């Protein structure tokens, strides 16, 4: 009985000293995937998280962030041509066409300016036929006049006479070029209409001219000059 007890005790001691298979960092399941090729590893082939063949995060074949096949940010082929687009050419101001502005000097007319558009005046010609003819054809007559600065004339009559002649001439030439002709009645009515418009233009220009002159006299007076010098 004593011999049997000693043999059983020895077997139990040997069992406690034997290593258990499949522990941490042994031939069993391991993490991370290093060591025995037969182990159950995750990831399976030594790459980073989500990398079948190695590379950065989310990169099937290597490259920068979010790049399936390499290259810079947001570029499939690695060339930086997304940020170097040529700027659009600026519009050439010489190619912008426009009508002559009111008050601007008209080229080719020797310093004449084009006045602002006016409403054609209501004129009575003394008989029903001409009155009716004017009402029906007034849209064919000018609503702007050509003129020179008032300081180039001695009086209103000279200004108006020159204004009427150049305006009717220019309007007739322009309209005839378009294939429309004027009768004697048209010319008579245009003279009356344009004359009234030239008188209105003279009054506007004279008022503006004298206002500019008054301002110059005011600012050139000695008290005002002294006051401005003191303020400066």
From Swiss-Prot:
Region annotated Interaction with ADGRG6, chain positions: 16-31
GO molecular function: copper ion binding
Positions of the UniProt region annotated as Disordered: 17-90
Binding locations of Cu(2+) 1: 46-47
Signal peptide positions (record): 1-15
Glycosylation sites: 165, 181
Disulfide bonds: 163-198
Record has Membrane as a keyword: yes
Sequence repeats (start-end): 44-51, 52-59, 60-67, 68-75
Residues that, per the record, bind Cu(2+) 3: 61-63
Localization terms from the record: Cell membrane; Golgi apparatus
Annotated Cu(2+) 4 binding sites: 69-71
Stored SUPFAM superfamilies: Prion-like
InterPro entries tied to this protein: Prion (IPR000817), Prion/Doppel_b-ribbon_dom_sf (IPR036924), Prion/Doppel_prot_b-ribbon_dom (IPR022416), Prion_copper_b_octapeptide (IPR020949), Prion_N (IPR025860)
Annotated Cu(2+) 2 binding sites: 53-55
Keyword Signal: yes
Domain free text: The normal, monomeric form has a mainly alpha-helical structure. The disease-associated, protease-resistant form forms amyloid fibrils containing a cross-beta spine, formed by a steric zipper of superposed beta-strands. Disease mutations may favor intermolecular contacts via short beta strands, and may thereby trigger oligomerization.
Clinical disorder: PrP is found in high quantity in the brain of humans and animals infected with the degenerative neurological diseases kuru, Creutzfeldt-Jakob disease (CJD), Gerstmann-Straussler syndrome (GSS), scrapie, bovine spongiform encephalopathy (BSE), transmissible mink encephalopathy (TME), etc.
Family: Belongs to the prion family.
Its biological purpose: Its primary physiological function is unclear. May play a role in neuronal development and synaptic plasticity. May be required for neuronal myelin sheath maintenance. May promote myelin homeostasis through acting as an agonist for ADGRG6 receptor. May play a role in iron uptake and iron homeostasis. Soluble oligomers are toxic to cultured neuroblastoma cells and induce apoptosis (in vitro). Association with GPC1 (via its heparan sulfate chains) targets PRNP to lipid rafts. Also provides Cu(2+) or Zn(2+) for the ascorbate-mediated GPC1 deaminase degradation of its heparan sulfate side chains.
Descriptive protein name: Major prion protein
Source species: Ateles geoffroyi (Black-handed spider monkey)
Lineage: Eukaryota, Metazoa, Chordata, Craniata, Vertebrata
Gene symbol of the encoding locus: PRNP
